[in-house]
Regions:
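A domain-level signal for the structural core that forms small-molecule/cofactor-binding pockets
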Residues: 2-247
């Protein structure tokens, strides 16, 4: 009997399953394509799409679980660490590093109707950050001196923008410069001075273990830079505020 089967059966192409790219990789590829930097102290909130921060939190929690297991910590039987990964992911994305992933708080400026041009200082403002080398805390205080221009912002807004800027991995020198840039953008003062005094736990908690050591740095711009007497007045006002708080 003659066979009626075809001499050859065409093969069927099977497309292999490919898992979706991790959300962190998709975000990085988008930033690279746009030429946007994502250094430790950069803010990337404008480049995150709806729902991506929640997806990133899930991914980070998974990576923290891997880290804990690599440190030979039993996260399955120890009730103290069962939910540590989720807590750490939440903490990084929404608290200690929120200045990277969340937009700047809404800060309105107002016309300087009275044409005020005398300097004033705001502080001490508590600042909390993390050393970008070891991701351990930087804790300290900040003072801001302003010689108003045509626009002014409320006193509490200085605290809000300082918290937003410092809530990222930093080195202190860069943090102060970024804060100065943001304040200048918000109210365009005639003069701006910022002083930060902070303790670095990369020196206090590890390494040389110097518990009393602190770092002090400042930035002066505009009239504070051009007029030495204004600069001296700012530092004197800071000293008076410190003395008042210590009594």
């Amino acid at each position: 009997m003659t066979s009626t089967l075809p001499s050859s059966i065409p093969s069927r192409t099977i497309t292999p399953y490919s898992a979706p790219l991790p959300i962190s990789l998709r975000i990085r590829e988008r930033l690279d394509a746009a030429g946007v930097a994502y250094l430790a102290n950069d803010n990337i909130a404008d480049h995150l799409r709806d729902g991506e921060l929640e997806q990133l939190e899930i991914e980070v929690a998974g990576k923290v679980r891997e880290l804990l297991r690599s440190l030979v910590i039993d996260i399955d039987k120890d009730h103290n660490t069962e939910e540590t990964a989720e807590r750490v992911a939440r903490m990084y994305l929404h608290e200690v590093f929120k200045g990277r992933y969340h937009e700047q708080p809404k800060i309105a400026s107002f016309p300087n109707v009275k044409k005020l041009d005398e300097i004033y200082t705001v502080g001490p403002i508590s600042v909390r950050s993390a050393c970008s080398h070891h991701l351990v805390p930087i804790l300290g205080n900040c003072w801001i001196g302003i010689k108003p221009g045509d626009r002014v912002i409320g006193l509490s807004k200085f605290s809000r923008v300082a918290d937003w800027v410092f809530s990222r991995p930093h080195i202190q020198e860069e943090a102060v410069m970024i804060l100065a840039d943001e304040i200048e953008r918000l109210c365009e003062p005639q003069g701006l001075a910022i002083l930060v005094k902070a303790q670095h736990y990369c020196m206090k908690w590890r390494g040389v273990k110097e518990p009393q050591t602190s770092m002090v740095n400042s930035v002066v711009r505009g009239d504070f830079r051009l007029d030495p007497s204004l600069k001296a007045e700012f530092f004197e006002l800071v000293k008076q505020q410190e003395c008042m708080l210590s009594t």
